[in-house]
């Protein structure tokens, strides 16, 4: 079976709406249209972080800002290369990655980050920019903090209106808030525990 990040065309031939022309789109049709939201679900050591990073790589060039929320981003070497790429991109855009943090261990800064994104999108609309700025949020290893998180649920349900995409992971399907589960654009499933299954919609 071909991994989703190696597929160049969406198997269902999904076409974006005219309004989605506001956002730059990735080259791979499988990840169109952005903004998007994808959950990566598998048991521990099931490859969730690896798959999330592969998808991030395919979306990287169309995102103006990438923010990481992870309890393990300092310890897990899998994040090091991405954090360096983000810092380099910020420097290229005249931003200081030391002053403008992009990696966090809790969702405390999420409201501020979303507020800033709304302001950037509105400024782009006021200028008449061809493409509006996009934000990619990575929520990894945050099990327990995604349940009942209304702010994160709003990203899934309304984030597309202000250019916010979300990639999140969980060891179980039910580790993700029910409102998020109902509205995610897609799932990437690895090996699940015997007691776990996809909920009926």
Q: For the regions a protein language model found, what residue spans apply to each?
A:
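Basic, amphipathic N-terminal segments that precede the first structured/catalytic domain
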Residues: 30, 43, 86-88
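Conserved P-loop NTPase motor cores
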Residues: 24-27, 35-60, 64, 71-75, ...
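Nucleotide-state-sensitive switch-loop elements of NTP-binding domains
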Residues: 85-102
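N-terminal pre-Walker A segment at the start of P-loop NTPase domains
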Residues: 1-27, 73
């Amino acid at each position: 079976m071909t991994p989703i990040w190696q597929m160049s065309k969406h198997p269902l031939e999904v076409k974006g709406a005219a309004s989605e022309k506001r956002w730059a789109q990735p080259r791979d049709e499988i990840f169109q249209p952005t903004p998007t939201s994808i959950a990566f679900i598998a048991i521990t050591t099931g490859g969730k972080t690896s798959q999330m990073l592969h998808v991030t790589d395919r979306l990287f060039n169309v995102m103006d800002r990438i923010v990481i929320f992870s309890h393990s981003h300092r310890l897990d070497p899998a994040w090091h290369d991405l954090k360096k790429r983000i810092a380099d991109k910020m420097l290229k855009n005249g931003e200081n990655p030391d002053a403008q943090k992009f990696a966090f261990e809790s969702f405390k800064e999420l409201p501020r980050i979303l507020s800033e994104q709304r302001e950037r999108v509105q400024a782009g609309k006021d200028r008449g920019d061809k493409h509006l700025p996009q934000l990619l949020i990575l929520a990894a290893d945050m099990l327990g903090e995604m349940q009942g998180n209304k702010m994160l649920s709003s990203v899934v349900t309304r984030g597309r209106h202000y250019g916010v995409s979300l990639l999140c992971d969980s060891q179980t399907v039910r580790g993700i808030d029910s409102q998020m589960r109902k509205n995610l654009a897609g799932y990437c499933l690895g090996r699940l525990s015997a007691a776990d299954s996809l909920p009926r919609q």
